[in-house]
């Protein structure tokens, strides 16, 4: 049975979370797009996935994840270090965990952080941080991995986030695969598999057609031979 992954992108719409240097771009819209791409990647890798409805409050999202029997609860957010319109100075991913270092949450969050840092281009070390106040961390009985992907109030980070929505989704998927010990299937590999399946189906159809023609011809020859006796 497939593991169940529940995705919860930022629920607050504009004007929450403006992206520095990108007028009209907001955290909600970006994380919803990343969540949809992550869902597609996870399904490609064999996982069952649900994405929270954009309008659902946190309580409803957590309740839905619990009722569904989610194995892994994945909020998707981008970060901010300033509450003003000035550019923030902080950069880089961080992942929020509950419990002590070495526990299940911390280890899963470390996997997500390590995967993000394989993609992120700058040398930062925000790491995994303990959080016991966020609702989607302290009210989720299943494993919760809470990435803050980068800082949307920093120009360089905002650019990186917008230029890498697809790669970020693949990175989050790789982290899930690493946690559960399953194979990550890259998009190209999946496409090649689908192409191979289509090619095989076409060859099998040709084979069946030629076999049918052979049987018909054999019957005609047999009938002709019988008529000549």
Predicted regions and their residues:
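A short, glycine/acidic-enriched catalytic loop
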Residues: 14-26, 80-111
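Alpha-helical coiled-coil heptad-register detector
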Residues: 195-198, 202-219, 223
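Acidic, proline-/serine-/threonine-rich low-complexity intrinsically disordered repeat tracts
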Residues: 187-197
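Active-site-adjacent mobile loop/cap segments within catalytic or ligand-binding domains
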Residues: 3-8, 12, 17, 68, ...
